């Protein structure tokens, strides 16, 4: 894909990041949903960075308020490739009551997921998006606590390395 230009390769690269928390998740139903989406040509997104503090995961302001055995998410993410068309967006946040880290699956087509804008002037779509009273069902939680923290770092470790090659013009 990089042969045709970096913008074509970018969609694939970001999909690798979006799949990281899904592949590492103990949630088998979400892993199967991701596999089905892949088989049908779906792309994925990795909702980690925020406008105010980049990818400083200690400072994430995506808040998940408990609602029974589920959550309601509020917050925004910035510079998220494929954030407009992803089959699944893996989103990192914190439980509002405990501060526990949570990775969950979001759907850009569902109510409460608002695309703010494309933040780049290219054919790639790099989103700023906001979750506003976005319901997160218990079966959409990918990881909690240490597992969520580890999934964020492991995904970056595995998936971001390709961006270095692009930045020096190899792709």
Report each predicted region and the residues it spans.
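A structural signal for short hydrophobic beta-strand segments in well-ordered beta-sheet cores
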Residues: 62-65
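A short, Trp-centered hydrophobic/proline-enriched beta-strand micro-motif
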Residues: 40-48
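A glycine-rich, basic-preceded beta-loop-alpha segment at the flavin cofactor/substrate interface
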Residues: 128-160
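Internal helix-loop-helix
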Residues: 1-41, 81-85
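A short core secondary-structure module
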Residues: 70, 74-114
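Short Gly/Pro-enriched turn/cap motifs at secondary-structure boundaries
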Residues: 52-55, 79-82, 94, 118-126
């Amino acid at each position: 894909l990089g042969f045709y230009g970096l913008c074509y390769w970018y969609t694939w690269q970001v999909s690798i990041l979006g799949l990281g928390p899904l592949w590492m998740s103990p949630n088998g139903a979400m892993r199967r949903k991701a596999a089905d989406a892949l088989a049908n040509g779906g792309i994925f997104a990795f909702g980690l960075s925020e406008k105010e503090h980049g990818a400083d995961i200690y400072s994430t302001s995506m808040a998940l308020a408990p609602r029974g055995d589920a959550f309601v998410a509020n917050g925004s993410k910035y510079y998220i490739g494929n954030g407009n068309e992803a089959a699944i967006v893996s989103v990192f946040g914190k439980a509002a009551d405990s501060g526990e880290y949570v990775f969950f699956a979001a759907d850009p087509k569902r109510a409460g997921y608002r695309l703010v804008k494309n933040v780049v002037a290219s054919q790639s779509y790099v989103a700023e998006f906001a979750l506003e009273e976005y319901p997160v069902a218990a079966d959409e939680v990918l990881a909690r606590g240490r597992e969520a923290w580890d999934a964020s770092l492991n995904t970056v470790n595995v998936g971001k390395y390709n961006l270095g090659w692009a930045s020096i013009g190899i792709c």
